[in-house]
């Protein structure tokens, strides 16, 4: 059987174009992330699937880290996806402090610029503006932080399961430009099936 150019143009080319557009959109606009561990409990659990807004911190040329349009700067309390500075593995952690802020942590409890973030209304949680982080301190608080000044353009990212998270307390600060996107919502949770839980 012989295939003509007309057949290729009508049948194959549209499918190839659609595949290229879908993969480019996943690279630059939105994607999903599978949570591999419990380092973000009690906010995210192992097996959760999360929608990631890749335009939150800027619109990039597909498959690169080159910004076409600059986006918002990350804010404390946001949950972000980025590569680990230690080994390049894709991670999801909470941004707890950004450039110009000073972070301290004792027994898993965070203070930023001298203000403790522990929620009075919801014990075991921390308040980041309107965002509430439900912590897991069952394994202790992990390493402490003493007066860490965050330089401009950098940020501190830490897991909500403070005693069971390999995070910025181990590998240090990350550059804002290294963020792939902001986690928006959990869309699938083991045991519950499809859900929509905003982060």
Indicate where each model-derived feature is located.
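Soluble "head" domains of membrane/secretory-pathway proteins
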Residues: 2-9, 24, 28-199
